[in-house]
């Protein structure tokens, strides 16, 4: 699996192509899986497949907010989201995995629409998350890596592996 640094070396267009595939890959992975399999955690620390799907959906909401804000503001700061708190607050284990994938798909389409509208200068615009500075260019590498990471986690969870 490529690292964030590997993705950062790729052209932005290649990173976005990777991101375009994620909704279909996630839908294919959960298709035909029982609720018991989707909700099964491989161990006490790791998420079930449906939790991975919900996390990707909600992370996309965060990425979309960044992509809407950064072109319009000078170096905005965003808090670092606590994924486990969000998972508990939004009751991921009670969510419908297919619905989470459908919502992720909708949000991802909007995110990709926003990225296609960015100018070369806007890709260089900076912001921070939890005090860590980055650019929209770096965000695209993070998104591609994040997709790979959590798709792999989702697939392992379906197999009952951590």
Which stretches of residues belong to each language-model region?
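Short helix-to-loop capping/linker segments positioned immediately adjacent to catalytic or ligand/cofactor-binding
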Residues: 36-41, 96-100
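Active-site rim elements
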Residues: 10-13, 96-101, 137
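Short, contiguous alpha-helical
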Residues: 2-4, 39-83, 112, 124-162
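Extreme N-terminal tail/first-helix region
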Residues: 1-21
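Acidic/histidine-rich alpha-helical segments that form the ligand environment
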Residues: 18-29, 86-124
């Amino acid at each position: 699996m490529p690292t964030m640094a590997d993705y950062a070396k790729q052209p932005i267009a290649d990173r976005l192509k990777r991101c375009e595939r994620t909704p279909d890959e996630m839908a294919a992975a959960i298709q035909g899986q029982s609720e018991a399999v989707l909700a099964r955690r491989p161990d006490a620390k790791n998420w079930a497949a449906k939790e991975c799907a919900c996390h990707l959906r909600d992370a996309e909401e965060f990425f979309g907010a960044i992509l809407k804000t950064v072109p319009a503001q000078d170096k905005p700061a965003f808090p670092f989201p606590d994924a486990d708190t969000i998972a508990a607050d939004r009751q991921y284990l009670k969510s419908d995995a297919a619905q989470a994938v459908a919502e992720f798909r909708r949000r991802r389409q909007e995110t990709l629409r926003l990225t296609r509208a960015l100018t070369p200068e806007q890709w260089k615009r900076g912001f921070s998350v939890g005090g860590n500075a980055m650019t929209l260019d770096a965000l695209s590498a993070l998104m591609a890596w994040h997709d790979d990471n959590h798709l792999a986690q989702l697939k392992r969870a379906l197999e009952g592996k951590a």
